């Protein structure tokens, strides 16, 4: 597995939880996977905040109606959608994750 630097990469994003409801926060790339830190009332509540590399089946980045989007699909067939992502930051986060997944 490719080693991720100890410095965490941060991407502002909003996690889609129910229909058109979003939880705003930040995605972090860490050594063990991708982590989501929610802001506001739902910070540290019952939303998924950790996506370990061995749980991620696929990750993709692309254009959506809400600038750009990151989708993380787990082996349990759940898709986690993060909208309002910056193009440059989103690509910078997804690329090393894909590299780690291809080497696993």
What annotation goes with each model-predicted range?
Residues 66-95:
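Short, compact, well-ordered microdomains
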Residues 1-31, 85-87, 92, 99-104:
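Anionic N-terminal interaction surfaces
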Residues 60, 74-76, 97, 101:
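Generic hydrophobic/packing signal
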Residues 17-23, 31-71, 78:
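Phosphoinositide-binding peripheral membrane targeting modules
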């Amino acid at each position: 597995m490719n080693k991720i630097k100890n410095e965490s990469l941060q991407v502002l994003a909003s996690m889609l939880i129910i229909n058109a409801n979003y939880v705003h926060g930040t995605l972090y790339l860490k050594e063990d996977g991708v982590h989501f830190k929610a802001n506001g009332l739902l910070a540290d509540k019952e939303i998924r905040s950790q996506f370990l590399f061995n749980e991620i089946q696929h990750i993709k980045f692309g254009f959506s109606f809400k600038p750009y989007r990151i989708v993380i699909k787990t082996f349990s067939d759940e898709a986690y959608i993060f909208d309002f992502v910056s193009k440059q930051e989103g690509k910078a986060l997804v690329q090393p994750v894909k590299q780690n997944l291809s080497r696993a």
